[in-house]
Amino acid sequence: MSCAERATYHHGDLRQTLLHAAVRHIREQGTEGLSLRALAREAGVSPTAPYRHFENRTALLAALATEGFRELEERMRAASVDAERDPVAALHALGCAYVEYARTHPVKYHLMFGDLIGDFSPFSELLDAAETCYGRLERVLALGLEQGLLRGPDLQELGGHTWASVHGIAGLVIAAERKRATQPDLPIDEIRPLCAQRRVLESPERAVARLMAGIVIDDGALAALRRRTGDG
């Protein structure tokens, strides 16, 4: 850790310093070996100092996931600001924002949607952040249903299907990015699944739009969506 980073502790920012260090550790080494004591050594503070902010390792991971949901919700909110006027365009922008967040913040994304933390209920801030984030998607879908632009038996099922679709795209994008970074000489053109994965990475916006085509029932909205992504 640099002198500047160490200095942040003395200004009362140890909590954020530990969170940044945890992301760096997970990105470089995975979660194995991650502990509050190890992070304390990296921050140059006493082994007990992190416990003033986090009860245990799981609490620290929950804080990272909470931060992630709040960041994602901000991006989804910005993407869907025009949802009342055009729910379909807003849904596409929201889906693209979701995928882009996953691509640029894979550590937090895996904590948010993986099973490392487990039950969210002991962490009220995490639970609230996750529900607020999902509420952004639900609001746009509800507007689309109300305006007769989207098909779906009910809001809950439509939400699950839409989330699953975009989540799948995000997973492929993360995997393709990782392979490109760690295996640059991999003969992707000779491996059909990896070639398909790369195509999604090259144009996630088009992938989101094509999946949305299955739930958009308004011809005008569908045509506008295709024009927006150069797909028609």
Label for each model-derived stretch:
Residues 14-22, 39, 64-68, 72, ...:
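Generic hydrophobic, amphipathic alpha-helix propensity
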Residues 2, 134-147, 171, 175-232:
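C-terminal peripheral helix-coil segments that are non-catalytic and often amphipathic
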Residues 67-91, 122-131, 140-142, 146, ...:
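Amphipathic alpha-helical linker/stalk segments
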Residues 26, 61-68, 112:
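Alpha-helical DNA-contacting segments of helix-turn-helix folds
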Residues 17, 28-59, 63:
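Helix-turn-helix
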Residues 100-101, 107-139, 185:
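Short secondary-structure transition hinges
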Residues 77-108, 159-162:
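Hydrophobic alpha-helical connector segments
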